[in-house]
Design a protein with these regions (language model features):
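Flexible, polar/acidic helix-loop-strand segments at domain edges
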Residues: 1-67
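Long, intrinsically disordered, low-complexity segments
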Residues: 34, 41, 55-65, 96, ...
Length: 185
């Protein structure tokens, strides 16, 4: 099969289709039962409708540096740690109501907050935004959470993963070993 720019090559319907229905298409159909670590739908928030093809790197979407939802979640955590449950709940609900489907705002609200809810809310709201490792490191539960929620990585995760290796070139350029490699690397 020969494709040209603009042709559909992979279709991700978001629902199951029969094998016969998938086979009738001249492109790959990726249904939920086929999702794996290599094939899965991208996060919609990163979708760039103006990008003409996968080789075009200059997308039209801005990079997320910081979002208001992140600020509310930081506020919720700070208020929780200060024992201000009401204020923490209000900050979490500001994020949840904004993300709710129309007419479902009240169903999304929480009435109490604990640290586990804050950790999970940050994981959901900030998925794919490159903040998770820093959060887990800051909370000192990186190894615990990886073992609990990522069975593929659980085997190899260790305490050294709280830090990253420093590029060897940087270590080599430092005067008198003033920039040593992080322990374990």
């Amino acid at each position: 099969v020969t494709y040209k720019a603009g042709d559909t090559t992979i279709f991700i319907p978001g629902y199951e289709m029969s094998l016969a229905e998938r086979a009738s298409k001249k492109y790959q159909v990726l249904v939920p039962s086929l999702y794996n670590y290599a094939l899965f739908p991208t996060l919609k928030k990163f979708f760039d409708p103006l990008r003409p093809d996968m080789t075009y790197e200059n997308g039209s979407r801005d990079y997320f540096v910081h979002r208001l939802a992140d600020t509310y979640l930081m506020l919720a955590e700070a208020q929780f740690k200060l024992g201000k449950q009401t204020e923490s709940v209000a900050a979490i609900n500001a994020v949840r109501v904004r993300a709710a489907a129309k007419g479902k705002e009240d169903a999304m609200k929480v009435t109490s907050v604990d640290m586990n809810l804050i950790m999970e809310e940050r994981a959901r709201e900030l998925a794919g935004e490159q903040t998770r490792w820093m959060d887990l490191k800051r909370w000192n539960n990186l190894v615990e959470r990886v073992k609990l929620y990522n069975t593929d990585a659980a085997v190899g995760v260790r305490d050294i993963h709280y830090v990253r290796p420093i590029p060897q070139k940087q270590v080599d350029l430092s005067e008198n070993g003033g920039f040593p490699q992080n322990s374990g690397y």
